[in-house]
Amino acid sequence: MELPTPQKVQEPPKSFEEFLKSQNWDYWPRDVHIRDGDIWENTLRKLEEAVSYNSVYSYLWTNVPRLYEIVDSMESKLKECSHLLQQHASRLFESDRLISKKRTYTNLDRYKAFLKEHYRRKKIVLSDQMETEKNIEGCTFLLKQNELTQLPRHLDAKQIYLYVLRTHNLEEKVFKVWKTHILSDCSIALLHDCFWWWFLHKFKPDKRDQDWLFDRIAESYVTLFMRIPLRRKDIFFQMYPDWLAQAVYTTFQESFPESCSLFNDNFKEDLGNTIFLWLSGLKPAPGFWTHWKLQDLCTTTIHGCRRVPVKLRRGIMSSQEHTSATVGLKIEDILKNPRALPVLKEESAASKVTTKSHYRSLGPEFYKVLFDFGGQSPLILYYLKMHELGGISVTYNPKGSKFTKILREPPPAPTYCEIIKDAKRKFADNKKDFKRVKQRIKDDIKFLKEQQEQIDKELDRLQAKASKNLQEVKNDFENFLHKLRVEAKLKEEYRGSASPSESLQSLQSPNSSLSSPAMSEDFNSVEEGGLKEARSDHYLRTTHSSFSSINLIGGECTTKSTFCCSSLKSSHQ
């Protein structure tokens, strides 16, 4: 059986000509016959001339507007400037003596560090004509329905928001995220309208303007609520009411520095409660404003400048009228740049942060309440009701959980800090008294030792004289006894005229010797325990032995005087 011979597979065409040949199209267009060939050839030749490179270039050159002249002139100027720069640089660095590489680099680093440390944003310095009133009485509200009413004293809402954010010391990434949301136009509108609504509510009530502002506040809050991404809504709106309350409070402090006494703790409590209830429908915890880091606003602006104290400013303004023109003191410069002015001790002490201390009592009374965690924002409900949006139910099923709430605060009582301070003060007073009494006891012991030494020396001298002349010994001894009696009498008179505390602390009489151990024992039990008590007992024994030695010496002297008198009588007889 014969096998079929394999057929050769035809290769695909590799070029356009091979493709035409494989399709039997290689004869086209050779077989095309055109009438009036001369006319077609002439037309084809003209067409080739019209679409040539030279013709197209010449046409574009004449008809298309060119900007190359401007570019050429700019390039020529840049080349000229580059040449001048190189020439100037060559003149600067032609000598190596003019530069020091090490010193240049060190100075550069030092200058960069200096600029980084003292860099501050540019601030708008208001002239005297632009200065406005800095108290509540001199401020008025002008409602603008189609635009926001500007804050007093040309304040910028963005700067106030940034100041509040920086006080929280947020991380850089978190700061950038919240910054984009809190500096949005609807958040700025909330700050403006909330500030003016609270200004009218607290100081200059106007029902019509307040209602208009409240409508706009609701619209701004709904717009902000819809713009925040869903994944950030919960976290953002947990912190935003507190941030807005701080921003409004900061605006009041910056707008009316002369009325800062009105912005007390009650003002902050009412402001925060109102904003929290508007935005979330829940009241914050009592004393929520204690964590605000805005204590320095009374003495420092949001830009870091020191405020001129009100009393000092009034004094300067009153003295300005009596200042002569020859004195080179510029009051305006001092008022515009008060950084060099000293801060009053009262204001600096008020800026110190005080830690809260609890009362020494049983604490507040508590009770259980139902906490509704399905509450809604009154602003959003008001917005829905105002626009009468259909198909949206504003009612909800109450869901809640019991939690503990304070029923009654404890009555005022000494706090633990006050008790600790009082105990420390008493301990310091006792320590001072102990040191004073201890020093007095040491002085008394030293005095007794010196007196004992004097008595011993006097007795030795009398014993030495006894062997020489009995009459002289008798006279000297009588003089010595008379001297001791006079000193004892003077001391008794002095003790009678002295205060009871001094008579108790004296060690010259038996009563003082009995009272001083009790006093020393009290101080020893407070400060040093048994060791000081042992020392006081040793001191008592020493004092007792000293007095006994004095008594023995007195008895010996009496015996010697009797012996001397008897010997003198016998010799005389």
UniProtKB/Swiss-Prot annotation:
Q: Which domain of life is it from?
A: Eukaryota
Q: Which keywords annotate this record?
A: Coiled coil
Any one Pfam family here would be FWWh
Chain positions covered by the region annotation Disordered: 497-528
> Where does the record place a coiled coil?
429-485
- State where composition is biased (Low complexity): 497-521
Checking InterPro entries in the record gives:
FAM227
Q: Tell me which PANTHER family the record gives.
A: PROTEIN FAM227B
Family label: Belongs to the FAM227 family.
Name assigned to this protein: Protein FAM227B
What gene makes this protein?
Fam227b
